[in-house]
Every structure is written in structure tokens, then in C-alpha cells.
A protein has these predicted regions:
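Elongated, non-catalytic scaffold/linker segments and compositionally distinctive motifs
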Residues: 35, 61-66
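Short, glycine/charged-rich beta-strand-loop motifs at protein surfaces that mediate ligand recognition
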Residues: 300-301, 332-334
């Protein structure tokens, strides 16, 4: 065996952090496990911090992740696996908005990690080629997720009216306790993508409580004539108890910015529930911020216009960077009162011919199909040949080959695709990483942290709060005192 008989890709992964495997899967760079396919590729990635060596075969080149670690000021692998959240702020012109989101910007960390790995790989004679995140010829994908917490007939109707003509780009996540008994609302949602937002609008700390709430919400929507697909946790919160509940119920996908935001989809905890991160800034937090920062002299109308301008800019920035554009908002008191925010945001997205406007359910199906594709890349006489398998029937896949500062984007048409390694066609400059909006740290409020630790809320009826756990007992006792 010599190095020319082995494919340039897939990468062969030895004992490496889970976050590297996840990042490569998100990126679409093919890889195999060394324990399963030891001769699967020319380059072996290993971590001497966790193993005794590369155990490379003749003709293989080993790349040690320890060399990457030495250039970092923090452990990117650990940060990518972190599941805690923190209060984070952003500035929209003069208005400072804040939300509780994932502690780390996982997109920025993943991009830094993979840029460093790409450099090491190319210096060793390898290439960087990936399966595109979107079907060919799309550059990005767009969805507006509407979270239906409470029900206001006027705001509900105004929101759906504003979305007319753009239904294929809308996903509705519905709280069943407030909507399942509203036949006029159910009737308008039929034919749309509907997901569950729970029965009660609360994300619990215990797996059994989350499972019961999600199951009840799904069953209530089904009884009303809807077939929900997917889940979005109230307040965007994530914890392992929620993931356990979602896994036990076989939920297809979920979306919580408390775990990740503005990032490519991934599977938390090596499970089966696909996480679809969204952009965390919405109309609601803009209105709240304007009311709190009275010294700015901004009314609700001005705050709504700032939010619209932000949505339009984030569409431009994310489209340029080739990122998913997944926005969200609420009808009651927000999009329903300022429907032009939704209407003009949707119109902006519709102006891009290479932007795939789709539901989160359809995007989740695409992402799963993308993850099943296999790629091998061979080099001969200056030509690269990509051999593929298990490509989806519903969509054309895209190959993205990195050549210096440029990227060539080619359709994956057929099981074999060949092109020049030095001068590929359909080549364009690689976009710079997106920097807008720039976050800043916000001090944690001890009272809010304590409430979350105790799982404090007033949504669940007192008689339905279980006292089998200490949190449930404490919450029920405090509710009896306060109520």
C-alpha cells in the first residue's frame, strides 16, 4: 500500500474529542472511524492528549490535535461541548438588547477549530472539500419560526395575514394549552408546518415532567386535527433532562438558543434529536429593551423598526456568509401588533433567488439525508475525482472545494465527479466570517438564576406540580404561600 492508493478523503479519525466529530459532520467533511475503517483514507487525525499514538498504516500521514491545542488560549473542544447558558447582550444602533443564550458562540469556535485543522491538513498535502450545507444551487436557507405562546385572536390573525404568500418559509410551534381549544386558530394552521411548543409554556428541570408536558402538548394538537413535527422549548431553554425527554418520545428535531444559536444543525449528546439553532434576537426583546431604557426616548414603534432593520441586515450578512437564516418571533403583542416587521422581513428574504425558503421540518429532513451521503476523493494527474454514495433523490447536493482564498461550488451530479485540483470551475472568493452583531457580556441576575435553579414558574397549575422531587415540593410550597 502506498499513499497514492489511499483517498485524500475521508479523514480517518482515531481517538478524538466528540466535538471534532460533530464539527466535521456539520461542515460536511467526510470522515470514518479508525477502529472500523483503518485504511479508509490517507490522513489520520488523532489526539495524543487522549491516546498513545496515531497507529497509522503505511502510506498514511498522522496529524496530532495537540499541535492545534497549543495555539489556543482556551480548549475549543471543551467549549464546543459546553451546554450551559449565560446572559448575553447585543447593540442594535442605540438600543442594547439581551437574551439568555448558549455560553459560547459555537459557530465562531467551530469555524476557528476547522480553519486551524484545514491549515494543518493542507500543509501535510491534503485538501479541504465538503458537502454543502444547502441543496445545490442554494447559497443559504431561510425560515421564520413563529412561537405561539399565548392566544390573542387579533394578533394571531394579523400575524398569519402578514405571512400570506410566504407559508413555505414559516414554521409554527404551538403551545397546546392556549391554542388546542381554539378551532379558528387550528383551522388557519392546517396545511402549515406545525411543531410542539409544549402543553404548558415552561421548560422543566426534570425529564419526566418535560416528557409529560411534551407528550400532552403533541396529543392535544393531534386531537385538534394537527400533526406536529418537532419541538421548540419555551424560553429557548435547554438541559439534559429536556434532551432525555425528547429522545424518549422520538421527537425529530428541536430548537433552543440556550444550547446554540446562529449555528449549523447538529445532534446533541450523540442522540437522534436534531438541533436546529436560530438567531436569538426577536421583536419581543427589542420592545422590552426600549421600555427598560427610557432615557433613549424610543417608543415601541421605533423599537419595532430597529428590529426590522436588524432582521434585514442579518439576512444580508448571513446570506453573504453562507449561513442558515433562521429567525423567530411571537404573534401576541409583538408580530401581531407590528405585522410589517414580519411582512417586510419575509419580502427581503424572497428577494434572493439562491435562498432556499423552507420549513424547519423540511430542512431537518434535508440535513439527515445530507448526513447519510458518503464521499471518497482520489487524486490522479492533477485531477480530483469524487466518488459518492447514498445521495438523496429529492435534492441535488453541492461539493465545495477550497482552493487557496477561493471556494469552488459544484453540483454532485452522478456517482463520479472529476475536476481540476488547481483550476476548478465555478470558483469564487471565500466569504469572510460574519462579525455582526457583536455580543457583549451581561451580568447575571442572582434572582433569575435562583428562580431557574428552583424551576420557579407560575404556568403549571398548582394541582399538577409533582412533589416527588425536592424542586417540585419547594415550588408547590412556595406557590401555595404566594398564590
Amino acid at each position: 500500500m502506498n499513499d497514492q492508493s489511499l483517498p485524500l478523503l475521508p479523514l480517518v479519525l482515531g481517538r478524538v474529542p466528540k466535538s471534532l466529530r460533530r464539527s466535521l459532520a456539520q461542515e460536511g467533511v467526510p470522515f470514518v472511524d479508525q477502529a472500523v475503517t483503518p485504511a479508509g483514507g490517507r490522513f489520520v487525525i488523532f489526539d495524543s492528549a487522549a491516546s498513545t499514538g496515531a497507529h497509522a498504516l503505511p502510506g498514511q500521514t498522522a496529524i496530532d490535535l495537540l499541535a492545534l491545542r497549543r495555539t489556543w488560549t482556551c480548549d475549543l473542544f471543551a467549549a464546543l461541548e459546553d451546554e450551559t447558558d449565560v446572559r448575553r447582550g447585543w447593540r442594535l444602533d442605540s438600543l442594547a438588547v439581551s437574551e439568555t443564550v448558549a455560553r459560547h458562540d459555537k459557530r465562531a469556535l467551530r469555524e476557528r477549530l476547522l480553519a486551524d485543522l484545514r491549515k494543518r491538513l493542507e500543509n501535510a498535502g491534503g485538501i479541504w472539500l465538503r458537502l454543502g450545507a444547502f441543496p445545490f444551487p442554494y447559497r443559504s436557507a431561510f425560515n421564520f419560526r413563529i412561537d405561539h405562546d399565548d392566544y390573542d385572536p387579533g394578533d394571531f390573525a394579523a400575524t398569519l395575514d402578514a405571512a400570506k404568500g410566504h407559508e413555505r418559509a414559516i414554521s409554527h410551534y404551538v403551545c397546546a394549552s392556549t391554542h388546542a381549544e381554539r378551532p379558528e386558530a387550528i383551522a388557519r394552521l392546517k396545511g402549515s408546518h406545525v411543531g410542539s411548543h409544549g402543553y404548558w409554556h415552561h421548560t422543566y428541570r426534570e425529564a419526566a415532567e418535560n416528557a409529560a408536558n411534551i407528550r400532552r402538548g403533541v396529543e392535544a394538537l393531534q386531537a385538534a386535527g394537527l400533526e406536529p413535527s418537532g419541538f421548540a422549548a419555551p424560553h429557548g431553554r435547554f438541559n439534559r433532562s429536556l434532551l432525555e425527554a425528547l429522545e424518549s418520545l422520538g421527537v425529530d428535531h428541536s430548537s433552543e438558543f440556550g444550547l446554540a444559536y446562529d449555528e449549523l444543525p447538529f445532534f446533541p449528546g450523540d442522540g437522534r434529536v436534531l438541533q436546529l439553532p436560530v438567531h436569538p434576537i426577536c421583536l419581543g426583546i427589542c420592545l422590552e429593551a426600549a421600555r427598560e431604557q427610557q432615557d433613549l426616548g424610543l417608543g415601541d414603534d421605533e423599537a419595532a423598526d430597529l428590529c426590522l432593520a436588524h432582521f434585514q441586515r442579518i439576512i444580508v450578512e448571513k446570506h453573504r456568509a453562507g449561513e442558515p437564516i433562521f429567525l423567530y418571533g411571537h404573534p401576541e403583542g409583538r408580530l401581531g401588533r407590528y405585522p410589517h416587521v414580519l411582512r417586510e422581513t419575509l419580502a427581503t428574504a424572497a428577494g434572493y433567488r439562491d435562498l432556499w425558503r423552507t420549513t424547519l421540518a423540511r430542512f431537518a429532513a434535508w440535513w439527515r439525508a445530507r448526513g447519510r451521503v458518503t464521499l471518497e476523493v482520489f487524486e490522479y494527474a492533477g485531477q480530483l475525482t469524487v466518488r459518492s454514495g447514498r445521495t438523496p433523490q429529492e435534492h441535488r447536493c453541492a461539493l465545495e472545494y477550497f482552493c487557496g482564498p477561493d471556494v469552488a461550488r459544484l453540483p454532485l451530479d452522478g456517482p463520479l465527479v472529476s475536476f481540476s485540483a488547481a483550476a476548478p470551475i465555478l470558483r469564487s472568493p471565500l466569504p469572510a466570517p460574519r462579525a455582526y452583531p457583536t455580543p457583549f457580556d451581561q451580568a447575571d441576575d442572582f434572582r433569575i438564576s435562583l428562580r431557574r435553579y428552583l424551576d420557579w414558574e407560575r404556568v403549571t397549575p398548582l394541582e399538577e406540580i409533582s412533589a416527588r422531587t425536592w424542586r417540585g415540593w419547594a415550588k408547590r410550597t412556595l406557590r401555595r404561600i404566594k398564590d
